[in-house]
């Protein structure tokens, strides 16, 4: 049932997929677990009053899950021009200049994709939070795992933002992406921890 191809590729010596793609994949799992809670709620008499709202969250999560799967590959694609730029020759001043320009261009994409991962996972948490509080109590532990995975996904993606921003010559752009990543990470971390603690109390 489990497709091990991605895991095996991740374990290989290939530079991509790496931490960014893995973070997107973990984010997709967070969305899937939140969806599981919703799907186990729909159709149950005890949750008739919230069924319409649950269906809304399920529809949103489906889109977010698909987007995160797309971002797994997008992260690998964003790394390719950066890796190619680092391999460019630098034997002459002209070659060195061309190499540096190529690196700087590639760094933009290499930071934007993990930022997109972070933004998307933060939205997953919105829906997971609702479903943890209003969805099936039988699946509440799965909502907690969703929160834990979402936290890991955001933290992982943030590292890719920071490491690439550190190499940017454009100090203003670097500052902006670092600040956005830091803000998303801080807020999402806090929300995920609160949600996880709520689930622990509910299931203990």
Show where each model-derived region lies:
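Short, hydrophobic/aliphatic alpha-helical segments
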Residues: 1-17
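Conserved phosphate/anionic-ligand binding catalytic regions in large, soluble enzymes, centered on
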Residues: 12-33, 139-157
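Amphipathic alpha-helix face/heptad-repeat signature
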Residues: 25-29, 57, 64-71, 106, ...
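A conserved active-site cap/scaffold subdomain adjacent to cofactor or substrate pockets
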Residues: 33-40
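Acidic, Mg2+-coordinating active-site segments of isoprenoid diphosphate-utilizing enzymes
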Residues: 40, 45, 82-89, 156-168
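A structural-propensity feature for long, helix-poor, extended segments
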Residues: 45-84, 184, 191
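Amphipathic alpha-helical interface segments
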Residues: 75, 79-148, 152, 164
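Preference for long, well-ordered alpha-helical segments
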Residues: 120, 124-127, 131, 139-199
